[in-house]
Amino acid sequence: MCIRDSGRALDEPASNKIRWGMLINTNQCSDECDACVTACNEEHGIEDFGRPTTDTQWIRKLKLTNDASGETINVPMMCQHCENPPCVDVCPTGASFVRADGIVLVNKHTCIGCRYCMMSCPYKARSFVHENLENQLPHAPRGKGCVESCNLCVHKIDNGDNSTACSEACQKDGQQAILFGDLNDSESEISKQLKKYKTTEVRSDLGLNTAVRYRGI
């Protein structure tokens, strides 16, 4: 039997004892760096068709400006993997769902491309695949006419690599802005930092209990 780093067998279903999430330190996210975006695109075979309004974006970097001070910060924005996701509530086929470990996913076989989930997402984190897809990667199947979004590199997690392409690239590039880990493990680095620092849940007023939190906002 093969065992993951988390102690879970490779053929064992996801467990609600774990909740995967991210802590993003905007103070460490620089203007000139797009390592997270590039890594995500390469990991999942996401191509740039030169149509910025419709091209698939699993991560996009937003720039926020403080009107009073004029200070700007960079905010990597992706699916926030809500505990109570609106996208799941509005999906008519059940294609959008939350896995036991908190990862929000889309079943490409049952997605009908209605895009209700895109309209319901307060983070504008989902994309509709308009183009024919070529050279797809075996670990990251995608489909024209489907909606998709960040899946926290679920293929890596399910193969025992408890990391994401974006967090690895951010660490490698020296920015160290993105930290990935188990929110339910009090001894994990992400849990320790969440206790130590003031963090923000984007649109906390909606009561979605997101798995992605930010510092510096």
Segments (PLM) and residue ranges:
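Non-ligating segments of multi-cofactor redox enzymes
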Residues: 4-217
